[in-house]
Amino acid sequence: MTSRERVVAALSHQEPDRVPIDLGAMRSTGIMAIAYNKLKRHLGAAGDTRAYDVVQQLAEPDECILDRFGADVVDLSRAFFDRPDDWKPWPLPDGSPALIPAWVDPEPDGRGGWLVRAADGTVIADMPAGVHYFHQACHPLEDATEPREFADLAAANAKVSWSAMACAPWHRPLTNPEHFADVRERALKLRAGTDRAIMGALGGNILEGGQFLRGFGTFLEDLAARPALAEALMDRLVESYLETIPRFFAAVGDCIDVVQMGDDLGTQTAAQVSPAMYRRFIKPRHTVVYEAVRKHFGGFIFLHSCGAIAELIPDLIDEGVQVINPVQTSCVGMEPERLKREFGRDMAFWGGGCETQGVLRAGTPEQVREQVRERIGVFGAGGGFVFTQVHNIMADVPPANVVAMFEAAQAGLS
């Protein structure tokens, strides 16, 4: 089987020749650049480290590393990593070197950390000394009281770190004809040059989109106490996504196998909102967005949603979601056996292969291998599983554990 065939078979709930593997095909299955530098030293690999996601400090895995670990999927944004003028040098928080996208401009904060400003000077992201991520520092619609204040989402999103510091191809609008043509050309080149499956990030966040714009607590208050205001913002988000979806798939739809949607619905112990509130406010809008995706795309719909979301999975299946990530198995109700038993016929699992909050960070290589074998035994039965760790590999994960994890994934149950 080719890598692409392996992924398609698994997501179609068929057992491939081995469980497919992902390292860095989207921004929650990757490795932090600090950890990646350590891994390269451990393996004797040379070359620059490219931190393509500046917010989360994620590295683009080199081809030699993808080959070494048997990776079967790549990120569409990889198509934008081949031109030297797309990159510039920048020191990581531990002082080790990296390259970052040329369109992102962190500046020293004068206290040993970094910040990023919008065009008008507003600080939209900060990374204090000793911290390994940029935090969102501005919720541009936090003080809005009327729906009319939601009209210009583009201006608001220019002050949201996640969109203002976006990864390719979202660093420029697809409404720009030159950028659209460039995205199309690069996507075709990437498709022709690999037999790996390709994932393209689209987003479509509803709950999270409201939280980015209004503030996490404020938007939850809106849903409970100001529902008309919350619905007005969510409807405006849906409108913007419906404008983007046809353009995105016209550019890359025939070059990708999986489209990555996103909406963090959970916490460590429960969903952020009750099932009743989800079904009233979020589900109808998710459904509209995912139906629009399906109208333009014949591949797999993948949803990244952190946390304890088991009670919402039946709704996600009903909406048309086919793949869930990161499968945060340490959260309440997210036990692998339960997830596979109750939802494995209709939902594929992309993640859950090794606990980043536990054994991957603090265990021994043999403990890592043991957990990987256990997870493949549960999630991999009958297909419906792409192996990757739970969310990103953190800066303090020992490189020997990373190697042990991917070697065990390649070996499977043998």
Residues covered by each model-derived region:
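Segments that shape or occlude catalytic/ligand-binding pockets
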Residues: M32-P84
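Short, surface-exposed loop and linker segments with low hydrophobicity and enrichment for Pro/Ser/Thr
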Residues: A10-D17, L66-D67, E107-G110
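Active-site loop segments of alpha/beta catalytic cores
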Residues: M1-R41, A45-T49, M127, Q136-S414
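Short, charge-rich binding segments
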Residues: C64-R68, S96-A98, D105-P108, L188-G193
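Ordered hydrophobic segments in well-structured contexts
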Residues: V73, L115-R117, A197
